[in-house]
C-alpha cells in the first residue's frame, strides 16, 4: 500500500470488491471469462512504500463488459482532435487526481463519468481490483482501476470536447500477436502487434502497439501506456503471459522507475517538497518485491 504523507484517508487505499459472481446478473459467460473476473477479484497488488505526491497522481478506468458470446471486452475512447495533448489517440477514460477525490477509485470513476457518462454506481459498475502504478511520460503516476459493467442497457454520453468516439476491444486479444478480427486485404502487410524499445534510465522501456481494426476510419492503434496497462490487466485476469515478450531485455522494474523519477525529475521533486515529502528519502524505499530475484523471478511486478 502507498504511504502518502497526510492525515487524510489514504488516497491510494485499495478498496475491497463488493461483487459476488453468483449474485451478479451477468449475461451468458464463458468459463474463461468467469475465471478472468475471479482472478481480477482476487488480485492483490504488491505493496509499495514509496511516498508519491498526490498532485502527480492520475487514474484510468479499465471498464470491462461481457459481450454477446460471453467474452470480455474493454471500453476505449478516441480522444478529440482538438485536445492540446495526445489528440486523436486511443485511450482509457481517466485523468488527474482532484483535491476533492477521496480515493483513486473515485478519481477514475469521476473521470469516466465526465468523459463518457459511465455511472458511478458501484452496484451497476462494481470494482474488480486496483493494479500497481504505471509511469506516463515521467510526468504522472497512473493507477489503473478495473471495473465490470453489469448493466448492458447503459448508453454512453460523450463529452464532445474530450471524446470523439467510444468503442470496445476484446481483452484477451492483448495477450496475442495475431488479430482477433478478420484482416482486410489492404492491411495484410500491417502487423496486429508491434513494439519499439525506448531509451530510459539504465535500460529501455518497451512500448507496444495493437491495431484496433478501425484504422481505416481514423481510429489510432492501442499504443504505449494504454497498451501496457491492458496487457497487465489481461495477464492478471487470464492467468498467463502473452505470446510475445512484454519487456525489453534491460528494462528496469516499475519500482526502479518510480524511485528514479521521484529523485531526479523536477516536477516530482517540487511536488513532493510542496507536500512535505523528502524525495531523496522516499526514492530510497523498497517494495516488498524489490529483492534481487524480483525483476526476473516475478515479471508481473514490472511495467
Task: Give the location of each predicted region.
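Cofactor-binding loops of NAD(P)H-dependent oxidoreductases
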Residues: 169
Amino acid at each position: 500500500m502507498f504511504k502518502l504523507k497526510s492525515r487524510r484517508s489514504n488516497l491510494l487505499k485499495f478498496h475491497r470488491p463488493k461483487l459476488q459472481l453468483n449474485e451478479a446478473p451477468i449475461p451468458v459467460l464463458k468459463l474463461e471469462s468467469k475465471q478472468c473476473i475471479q482472478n481480477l477479484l482476487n488480485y492483490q497488488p504488491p505493496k509499495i512504500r514509496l511516498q508519491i505526491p498526490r498532485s502527480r497522481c492520475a487514474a484510468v478506468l479499465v471498464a470491462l463488459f461481457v459481450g454477446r458470446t460471453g467474452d470480455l471486452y474493454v471500453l476505449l475512447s478516441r480522444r478529440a482532435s482538438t485536445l492540446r495533448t495526445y489528440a486523436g489517440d486511443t485511450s482509457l477514460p481517466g485523468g488527474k487526481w482532484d483535491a476533492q477525490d477521496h480515493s483513486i477509485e473515485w478519481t477514475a470513476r469521476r473521470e469516466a463519468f465526465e468523459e463518457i457518462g459511465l455511472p458511478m454506481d458501484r452496484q451497476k459498475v462494481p470494482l474488480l481490483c486496483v493494479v500497481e502504478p504505471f509511469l506516463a511520460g515521467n510526468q504522472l503516476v497512473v493507477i489503473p482501476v478495473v471495473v465490470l459493467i453489469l448493466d448492458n442497457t447503459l448508453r454512453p454520453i460523450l463529452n464532445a470536447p474530450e471524446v470523439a468516439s467510444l468503442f470496445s476491444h476484446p481483452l484477451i486479444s492483448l495477450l496475442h500477436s495475431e488479430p482477433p478480427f478478420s484482416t482486410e486485404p489492404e492491411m495484410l502487410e500491417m502487423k496486429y502487434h508491434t513494439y519499439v524499445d525506448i531509451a530510459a534510465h539504465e535500460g529501455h522501456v518497451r512500448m507496444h502497439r495493437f491495431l484496433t481494426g478501425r484504422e481505416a476510419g481514423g481510429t489510432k492503434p492501442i499504443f504505449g501506456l494504454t497498451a501496457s496497462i491492458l496487457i497487465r490487466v489481461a495477464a492478471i485476469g487470464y492467468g498467463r503471459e502473452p505470446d510475445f515478450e512484454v519487456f525489453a531485455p534491460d528494462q528496469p522494474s516499475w519500482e526502479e522507475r518510480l524511485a528514479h523519477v521521484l529523485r531526479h525529475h523536477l516536477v516530482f521533486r517540487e511536488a513532493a517538497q510542496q507536500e512535505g515529502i523528502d524525495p531523496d528519502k522516499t526514492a530510497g524505499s523498497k517494495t516488498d518485491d524489490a529483492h534481487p530475484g524480483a525483476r526476473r523471478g516475478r515479471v508481473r511486478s514490472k511495467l
